[in-house]
A protein has these predicted regions:
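Short N-terminal targeting/anchoring amphipathic segment
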Residues: 10-11, 70-87, 106
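Pol beta-like nucleotidyltransferase catalytic core
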Residues: 24, 265, 269-340
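Short amphipathic alpha-helix with an adjacent loop that forms part of the alpha/beta core around
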Residues: 68-73, 157-159, 298-305
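Surface-exposed amphipathic alpha-helices with a cationic face
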Residues: 93-100, 186
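Active-site proximal beta-strand in glycosyltransferases
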Residues: 97-112, 130
Length: 340
């Protein structure tokens, strides 16, 4: 689909700045884009409340979105592009279609539908639905399309690794059993392997909630965690000076996380709990070590870190780049195969 001069309403959660990169790409392709956050109130602590009380968040969002629609009813759109759409109400989608009867609505889901149960009720409003999760794609007959990495992440391997405290890196939001798995991995590492852990929690009160009500966090210390999302420059520096990345997917999802694709783009090795990764076309056991999230201990040999990363075919980097992702989102004939 040619996006030149197309008017797009882009609705997406604020997620470590990725919404800005997607917006910029759409504009570079010639589209005129208006951005709305998937959460009308999306400060970190508000985001946490959205996860705890999704029905309340949807009602509050609906009021704000309908007000926005009323104030902008003189604007017309060719496309609505939604990522996740957890808090969009049926009324908002209905009124948007009433105001823009010729507009196409596209939905991309980058979470498991088990984690976003309200989205399915809104499928009927969309002309095209894609998912990053292979299981959801099969079950609900959606278009399967994995996530992406940014183009600048594909250059992070250019500088050779020297002495670094960031040999093995974890960057991500702490949820479910992630903290426990990270601690188990730390204990299994060879003595000469160092780590840098950027464990993000939305707000200090969320940490205390976990610590009081979840036994996994009984020995957790507040200073272990970061309460602000990581800045892109720090992220790039950490990846540049590491040789491997820890990836722990949510227990309810099978789709590859953003961190997995970032590591692929940066040509870094991956230690992951997602066994489904072996079904993808870029899988190489030299580059990727699969571990069980339920094991009490692991064996991670030094050789995994010292052996050279084996590059994959250049066509795969193009396929999993943000350019390839956007092209597939708006393509009318996506026939790519991402699995072996």
């Amino acid at each position: 689909m040619n996006l030149k001069e197309k008017k797009i309403l882009f609705i997406c959660p604020r997620f470590f700045g990725y919404e800005k990169f997607i917006l910029e790409k759409l504009q570079l392709m010639g589209a005129s884009v208006i951005f709305l956050s998937d959460r009308a109130f999306d400060k970190p602590w508000q985001s946490a409340l959205t996860k705890l009380f999704p029905s309340i968040a949807t009602k509050l969002n609906s009021i704000l979105y309908l007000k926005w629609l009323k104030n902008n009813n003189n604007k017309s759109f060719d496309l609505m592009f939604v990522i996740n759409g957890q808090t969009l109400s049926k009324q908002f989608l209905y009124e948007f279609k009433e105001l823009n009867p010729h507009a196409k609505l596209i939905l991309y889901i980058w979470d498991s539908l088990k984690n976003k149960t309200t989205i399915q009720k809104k499928f009927k409003f969309f002309d095209r639905i894609l998912s990053f999760d292979p299981n959801d794609s099969k079950k609900y007959k959606l278009i399967f399309r994995p996530l992406f990495f940014l183009n600048n992440q594909n250059n992070l391997n250019k500088k050779s690794l020297k002495k670094s405290s960031n040999y093995l890196v974890f960057i991500g939001t702490i949820h479910s059993d992630r903290y426990k798995v990270i601690k188990t991995i730390e204990k299994a590492l060879p003595s000469n392997v160092k780590t840098f852990l950027y464990m993000h929690i939305q707000a200090p009160w969320v940490f205390w909630y976990y610590k009081i009500f979840n036994n996994m966090y009984r020995n957790a210390v507040k200073k272990e965690f970061n309460f602000l999302p990581i800045e892109q420059k720090l992220f790039e520096n950490l990846y540049r000076n590491s040789c491997a990345v820890i990836d722990i997917e949510h227990p309810l999802q099978k789709g590859l996380t953003m961190r997995t694709l970032e590591a692929l783009g940066a040509q870094k090795k991956i230690i992951t709990t997602n066994s489904d990764i072996k079904n993808y076309d870029f899988y190489n056991p030299n580059n990727i070590k699969i571990i069980s999230r339920t094991a009490k201990d692991y064996t991670i040999n030094t050789s995994f870190f010292t052996t050279k990363y084996q590059e994959i075919d250049s066509s795969l980097y193009k396929k999993y780049s943000i350019d390839g992702w956007i092209k597939d989102i708006f393509s009318t004939d996506l026939m790519k195969d991402f699995c072996r």
